[in-house]
Regions:
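A structural signal for short hydrophobic beta-strand segments in well-ordered beta-sheet cores
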Residues: 25, 141-143, 209
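N-terminal glycine-rich phosphate-binding loop and ensuing alpha1 helix
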Residues: 1-58
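Conserved alpha/beta core of the MobA/IspD/sugar-nucleotide pyrophosphorylase nucleotidyltransferase superfamily
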Residues: 1-3, 162-238
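Residues at the starts of beta-strands that form the adenosine-phosphate
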Residues: 2, 48-51, 71, 100, ...
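Short beta->alpha linker loops
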Residues: 9, 30, 56, 80, ...
């Protein structure tokens, strides 16, 4: 199993915090960054290969993307300023093809128990919080017959739930999703989320929800998100 971590974005909503660095290199309590914490936890749970997509800060990420017992490959998206991570996923496809995959965003902060549950769960999985209020600007998911049917920031309703971009996928699901991503790229649709491709083929992926209610699992999109994560992590390292 490999990990695919998306770090091609500019982090514009973070203001001065990302004026000269990507979000993944923001410091956390204990002397780690978001990225180094992700890599440490992934490595501790047996992930030996990580593919990291990059954009404006390839050099900085290359300097700091280091972890014992883990082989790290960078995939640069030279069109980062004009594309969304659907294009980064397209570029990364040759490095992940044929592998089971953990796919996550580079600004995602999570506690160790999330990985423990995710890796122990059977089948393809997405991470959800069924008890959380639906966020206005972040991902929500919708289920049908117990499987993920749709992911979007625009979903609202009683059948929707908060979803964080952390997926466990087998090689067949990776292949199907990447094939649909390639179709979108061929049509020039490069400014959408990779989940737009997922939404066209949910029946091929069979992704079930994994409830992570009460656990730390949060994207850092704003300074307020960053402060909240810092406060949760400050008392302890894990």
């Amino acid at each position: 199993m490999k990990a695919l971590i998306f770090n091609s974005g500019t982090g514009s909503r973070m203001g001065t915090l990302t004026a000269n660095k990507p979000k993944c290199l923001l410091p956390l309590p204990g002397g780690e960054t978001i990225l180094s914490r992700q890599l440490r936890l992934l490595s501790q749970h047996g992930i030996r290969e990580a593919v990291i997509t990059t954009g404006a800060y390839t050099g900085l990420i290359r300097q700091q993307a280091k972890c014992d017992r883990m082989e790290i490959t960078l995939v640069e998206n030279p069109r980062y300023a004009h594309t969304n991570y659907i294009y980064s996923m397209f570029l990364a496809e040759p490095t992940i093809a044929g592998n089971d995959l953990l796919m996550l965003h580079g600004d995602l902060v999570f506690e160790e128990q999330v990985l423990t549950r995710l890796l122990a769960a059977s089948g393809n999985r997405c991470c959800v919080d069924l008890s959380a209020h639906l966020p206005k600007k972040d991902f929500k998911g919708r289920l049908r017959d117990g499987c993920l049917q749709e992911v979007s920031v625009h979903l609202f309703g009683q059948d929707c739930f908060a979803l964080q971009p952390l997926y466990k996928l087998d090689a067949a699901a990776v292949h199907a999703w990447c094939r649909e991503v390639s179709a979108w790229i061929r049509r020039g649709q490069v400014q959408v989320y990779a989940e737009e491709a997922l939404n066209r083929i949910p029946e091929q992926l069979h992704i079930q929800p994994l409830a992570c209610d009460g656990l730390l699992l949060s994207e850092v999109d704003t300074p307020e998100d960053y402060q909240a994560v810092w406060e949760v992590l400050n008392p302890c390292r894990n």
